[in-house]
Regions:
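Short beta-strand micro-motifs enriched in acidic
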Residues: 28-30, 104-108
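HotDog/MaoC-like acyl-thioester-processing domains
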Residues: 1-4, 94-95, 106-162
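Glycine-centered flexibility sites
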Residues: 48-51, 55-56, 67, 96, ...
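A conserved, well-ordered hydrophobic junction motif at loop->secondary-structure transitions
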Residues: 37-61
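A generic structural signal for short beta-strands and their flanking turns/coil linkers
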Residues: 8-9, 21-23, 34-38, 79-85, ...
């Protein structure tokens, strides 16, 4: 199955390559499942209670993953921001464990979209999920990002992966 890697940012906490305290995650479009995916393992540096990933980190990963689902059509001009997000924590998410986050589009209205995301354990158990309302980023906001961020986005735009 071929997956298309999504672009990354320089500064973003979730995907930013130059963010020294960032998560440095990468997302891939899974066209067969109509979802975006990332796999990762979080160390105890990201815990709340011993052995449990902090809920704010989980919310961050859900926010980024569900938000990236709108880019499944490869139209990276459609980048959106979250207006509203509801997170449900179903089980503790353990540190030092391989995890998978997936995001899907529920409804796409052009400049607004409703998306969902979830974090899964290796056995498929969902530890947390979200539903979110997204809004298209105005061009005036993107214009303030500067050339370095724009160049990074262009440089990391999709390459087919096996």
């Amino acid at each position: 199955m071929k997956k298309l890697r999504q672009p990354t940012s320089l500064a973003c906490f979730a995907c930013g390559r130059k963010n020294p305290v960032g998560l440095h995650l990468e997302w891939f479009n899974n066209y067969e499942e109509k979802q975006v995916e990332t796999t990762f393992t979080l160390s105890d540096d990201y815990c709340s209670y011993p052995g449990t990933v902090h809920g704010g980190i989980i919310a961050t990963i859900l926010d980024e993953t569900s938000g990236r689902a709108i880019l499944l059509d490869n139209n990276f001009e459609r980048l959106m921001v979250t207006l509203k997000m509801e997170v449900v924590y179903k089980h503790n998410t353990p540190t030092n464990t391989p995890l998978k986050a997936i995001g899907r589009v529920l409804r796409d209205g052009g400049s607004r979209a409703q998306v969902e995301g979830e974090i899964q354990l290796p056995d498929g158990t969902v530890t947390a999920k979200c539903t979110s309302l997204l809004f298209k980023i105005p061009q005036a906001v993107k214009d303030k990002w500067g050339p370095a961020e724009t160049e990074e986005w262009a440089r990391t735009t999709p390459k087919l992966e096996e």
